[in-house]
């Protein structure tokens, strides 16, 4: 019977488990478990999240400050964010430390170079000094680095503002989603508690119906006991009639007929009771199978005993003692059956008491869970109010920070305007210094006879170059384009000036030297002719030659034009033309023009 009680308890637990839902949900705020697509709670939670818009917070930005940043930042890509987050320090510490400020400008310049499609900066390790890294840059890269170094404060503040805004938006959205998720979980818990209460009431009703059925079985058992007692009385009457059997055979037969009818009615009543008991036991499922077996065994025993009793009554004349023994055995079987029925009744009452205790414990547990849930709801409400107050204070601090940032951007705008004006003036002064030096260099290069003739043209070209450079500084706003145009203009002027200097130096002819060489050749010829005249036999004829006319006829017009008009032949040559070449060279006067 101990095994039978365990089976009954197991049956009750199976009923409770089958009635309860199979899906469990997490009570935590930040549960990472996700249900399937068919889960209604997850779908309702997703719908609730879609119905509520995400929190967003736009930072107040001055238009002038934004325009200043757009000149240097093409877009806030991940490279710029990594350059800011790589320092792991705030703008205050970065700006205060010169080394971190230079390294931050290095990272920003590298990002700008990469975005513009140019080769990246050379590698600069974290432990190396920035001075050694800056030596690896050329002039153009160093200029870009200088621009970013001057605007490090503005860029750092803007990046820090965007990072702070994104962090606040993420925290507020997570807070809102967590609150919404907690509210949905509380709704789910409330529905679960309602379902649990309904299940408990259903279990209570089922146990009540089970109690009613057990009472019906008890009443049927009492009826069966009454029938059995009536049957025993009838057997006593039969025994009395058996004593008087000798008196009247007909009365005995009538008694036998009555006994048969009574037994038949008892059997019918017993079968009806057995049918009702079997129906009740079927409804109790597997827990009452043993009861059904015992009742069937009892019915079989009773039917067997009744058949034996009927057979003994047929032979009652000869087997009276055997009939009495059978009746005694029948009484013993009835006593055993009554004991079994009493045990069944006692077991059913114990099962009902245990079920009532279980329901009471379930009710107390549900009440405790509801009280705990109410306390958790109050705590969640307090936390939600506290977070709401914190978010309001954070928003107020953000508004104050935006106002300070706007004022700072206005001051930086004025500072940048002053810086641009000073830079323009310094570039103009630098250009005038360079062109003054260019004037001096041109003067030095054109001081010779070969290049003296191109000095005016070079000065005119230098003035035109200066005018073009000043115009580019005044009317071109892009710094890089200004530098490119200035370098192009200066390069063109230097190329043209060098070409003119080379052409003048290579194409120059010194006509004084040419005239001097021609005169030297003529003097040599005259001396040769004079020496030949002395050796000639016809000395008189030769002496009559007019050498002056010969020189005039022998020289061309071009040579006459190239001769010095102010030069006069010395008297010594006229009187004595036959002289040495060394004397002629010594008397020739190279006067400047």
Swiss-Prot record:
Residues 449-457, 507-593 are cytoplasmic. It is a multi-pass membrane protein. Disruption phenotype: Embryo lethal when homozygote. Residues 1-24 form the signal peptide. Residues 25-427, 477-485 are extracellular. Its main location: membrane. Keywords: Cell membrane, Coiled coil, Membrane, Signal, Transmembrane, Transmembrane helix. It comes from the Eukaryota. InterPro entries: GEX1/Brambleberry. It is found in: Cell membrane. The keyword Zinc does not apply. Residues 156-194, 350-387 form a coiled coil. GO terms for biological process: embryo development ending in seed dormancy; embryo sac development; pollen development. The chain crosses the membrane at residues 428-448, 458-476, 486-506. GO terms for cellular component: plasma membrane. One of its GO terms (molecular function) is identical protein binding. In tricellular pollen, expressed in mature sperm cells. Not expressed in bicellular or unicellular pollen. Detected in ovules, roots and guard cells. Expressed in the embryo sac before cellularization, in the egg cell after cellularization, in the zygote/embryo immediately after fertilization and in the pollen vegetative cell. Homodimer. Has a dual function during gametophyte development and early embryogenesis. Required for correct pollen maturation. The extracellular domain (25-427) is sufficient for male and female gametophyte development before double fertilization, but not for early embryogenesis. The cytoplasmic domain (507-593) is necessary for correct early embryogenesis and mediates homodimer formation at the plasma membrane. This is Protein GAMETE EXPRESSED 1.
């Amino acid at each position: 019977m101990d095994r039978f009680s365990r089976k009954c308890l197991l049956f009750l637990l199976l009923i409770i488990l089958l009635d309860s839902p199979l899906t469990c949900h997490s009570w935590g705020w930040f549960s990472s478990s996700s249900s399937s697509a068919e889960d209604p709670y997850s779908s309702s939670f997703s719908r609730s999240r879609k119905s509520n818009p995400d929190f967003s917070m736009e930072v107040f930005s001055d238009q002038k400050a934004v325009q200043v940043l757009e000149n240097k930042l093409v877009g806030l890509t991940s490279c710029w964010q990594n350059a800011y987050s790589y320092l792991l320090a705030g703008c205050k510490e970065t700006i205060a430390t010169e080394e971190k400020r230079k390294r931050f400008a290095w990272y920003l310049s590298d990002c700008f170079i990469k975005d513009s499609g140019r080769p990246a900066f050379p590698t600069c390790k974290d432990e190396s000094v920035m001075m050694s890294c800056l030596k690896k840059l050329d002039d153009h890269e160093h200029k870009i680095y200088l621009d970013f170094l001057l605007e490090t404060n503005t860029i750092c503040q803007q990046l820090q503002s965007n990072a702070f805004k994104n962090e606040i938006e993420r925290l507020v959205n997570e807070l809102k989603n967590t609150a919404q998720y907690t509210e949905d979980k509380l709704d789910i818990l409330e529905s679960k508690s309602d379902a649990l209460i309904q299940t408990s009431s259903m279990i209570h009703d089922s146990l009540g119906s089970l109690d009613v059925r057990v009472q019906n079985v008890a009443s049927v058992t009492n009826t069966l006991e009454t029938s059995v007692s009536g049957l025993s009385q009838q057997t006593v009457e039969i025994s009395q009639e058996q004593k008087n059997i000798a008196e009247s055979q007909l009365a005995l037969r009538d008694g036998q007929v009555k006994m048969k009818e009574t037994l038949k009615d008892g059997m019918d009543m017993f079968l009806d009771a057995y049918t009702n008991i079997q129906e009740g036991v079927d409804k109790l499922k597997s827990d009452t199978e043993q009861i059904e077996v015992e009742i069937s065994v009892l019915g079989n025993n009773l039917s067997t005993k009744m058949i034996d009793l009927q057979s003994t009554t047929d032979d009652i004349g000869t087997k009276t003692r055997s009939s009495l023994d059978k009746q005694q055995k029948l009484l013993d079987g009835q006593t055993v059956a009554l004991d079994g029925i009493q045990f069944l009744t006692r077991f059913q009452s114990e099962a009902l008491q245990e079920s009532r205790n279980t329901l009471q414990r379930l009710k107390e547990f549900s009440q405790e869970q509801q009280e705990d849930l109410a306390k958790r709801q109050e705590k969640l409400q307090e936390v939600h109010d506290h977070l709401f107050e914190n978010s309001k204070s954070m928003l107020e601090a953000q508004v104050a920070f935006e106002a300070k940032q706007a004022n700072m951007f206005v001051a930086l705008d004025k500072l940048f305007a002053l810086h641009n004006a000073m830079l323009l003036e310094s570039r103009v002064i630098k250009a005038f210094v360079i062109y003054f030096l260019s004037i001096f260099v041109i003067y030095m290069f054109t001081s010779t006879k070969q290049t003296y003739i191109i000095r005016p043209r070079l000065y005119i070209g230098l003035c035109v170059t200066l005018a073009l450079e000043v115009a580019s500084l005044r009317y071109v706003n892009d710094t890089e384009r200004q530098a490119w145009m200035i370098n192009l203009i200066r390069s063109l002027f230097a190329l043209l000036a060098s070409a003119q200097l080379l052409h003048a130096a290579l194409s120059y002819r010194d006509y004084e030297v040419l005239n001097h060489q021609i005169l030297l050749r003529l003097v040599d010829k005259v001396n040769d002719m004079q020496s030949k005249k002395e050796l000639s036999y016809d000395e008189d004829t030769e002496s009559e030659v007019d050498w002056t006319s010969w020189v005039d006829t022998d020289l061309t017009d071009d040579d006459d034009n190239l001769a010095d008009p102010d030069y006069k032949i010395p008297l010594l040559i006229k009187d004595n033309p036959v002289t040495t070449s060394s004397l002629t060279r010594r008397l020739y006067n190279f006067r400047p023009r």
